[in-house]
Amino acid sequence: MPLFGSIFSPKKTPPRKSASLSNLHSLDRSTRELELGLDYGTPTMNLAGQSLKFENGQWVADSVISGGVDRRETQRLRKRNQQLEEENNLLRLKVDILLDMLSETTAESHLKDKELDELKVTNRRRK
């Protein structure tokens, strides 16, 4: 007989109970939230006295910054400003291209007018 006997030998574990008998695991997330009331709202936290809220995949300051303007509003205005600057740059480029095209056609027109005048002069000399 061993010194410690069968005290240290692992015993067989009892078989596990079957999986959950409820059908909640087969429901989609929104239905489960309605059934179980799992609507937690948006996550918020405080860091160094500043309140942050998780919106659209980013942590956004929930508090109002100096001057009474909301941080989300300033972000929206910056984004709109950048869009307008890009549009303005595109329009300037289009104007430059149109001016180049106009100067090219004007130069061609002047050359053709000059050539036509020369042909008229040579035609008069022949007569």
From Swiss-Prot:
GO BP, sorted A to Z: canonical Wnt signaling pathway; cardiac muscle cell differentiation; cilium assembly; fat cell differentiation; floor plate development; negative regulation of canonical Wnt signaling pathway; negative regulation of DNA-templated transcription; protein homotetramerization
Region (Disordered): 1-25
Entry-linked InterPro entries: Chibby_fam (IPR028118)
Subcellular location per the Swiss-Prot or TrEMBL entry: Nucleus speckle; Cytoplasm, Cytoskeleton, Cilium basal body; Cytoplasm, Cytoskeleton, Microtubule organizing center, Centrosome, Centriole; Golgi apparatus
Pfam families, alphabetized: Chibby
Any one Gene Ontology cellular component term annotated for this protein: centriole
Entry coiled-coil feature ranges: 68-110
KW Cytoplasm (keyword) present: yes
Signal peptide: none
Family label: Belongs to the chibby family.
Name by which UniProt lists this protein: Protein chibby homolog 1
Annotated organism of origin: Mus musculus
Lineage: Eukaryota, Metazoa, Chordata, Craniata, Vertebrata
